[in-house]
Amino acid sequence: MVFAGTPLFAIPALETLVKAGYDIQAVLTQPDRPAGRGRKLTPSPVKTRALALGIPVHTPENGAGAEVVVRALNPDVVVVVAYGLLLPPTLLAIPAHGCLNIHASLLPRWRGAAPIARAIEAGDAETGVTIMRLDAGLDTGPMLARAAVAIGPYETTEALTERLAHLGAQTLMPVLEALCAGRSITAVAQPSTGAMYARKLRKEEGAIDWRRDASALERQIRAFTPWPGTRATIAGVAVKIGAARVVDAPHAPAPGTVLTVEPDLVIAAGHQALAVTLLQAANARMQPARAFLQAHPLKAGERVE
């Protein structure tokens, strides 16, 4: 077996495979990238974990490089979890059991790079994981298993990602066990309707627009935690909003107007209002809104951006 993955989301699957005794010949992951304020070359989370587990690691720059590695190893199966590279059809044809992928949505909804954040942003009641066999398309391959979970009312992308990472590992195992035992697995083609694309998150999406409904803003905050964050200017200070809840505001003034500062910082939105509970200024830790307001006083009737 060859394992291909890059972020933290892929680690539970890798660890589960190791614990189950599968022979992982090698791990493919993205090359080291500059990270942090010093822009120091940093290995991916999967690379760090694989090396700690004693598994050989390869970091090809593209799909062609990945194919060279897989062709040399000729594995029975390749398990792909948030690898970050499109694999060419010639690579997909090498393993006898194909290339199996853990995708963090209930396909065909939310194909693409950011399925977890987009599900929260859209207000989906549930999401889940799909085990599919990769084909030449983008998350279009036949489905071998699915598992659904409800999205919690206060759940962020960070928290839901951790939950789905473990669910994906659990859902993968029966599929692999059946393949290794020679049992047939029904591969179900994805429906032709209901497909949606989860485009990659962009930093500029984090800017808050107080003219939107408060419910949409609350989902934006949860969807964009931890990245890119939801940004605003409050009391003249650029901040990242860490948490908020929707509150009624039957006679609210213009969007962006501060309604109250005690007991909560409540700001009018296009419909209803947002009670901001956690804030983070630049070079500071996330803190309760009350603590922020002690250092940066604000009055009802003032405007924020």
Question: Where would I find each of the regions flagged by the language model?
Answer:
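An anion-binding loop in the catalytic cleft
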Residues: 211-305
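One-carbon transfer enzymes
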Residues: 1-226, 281-283, 302-305
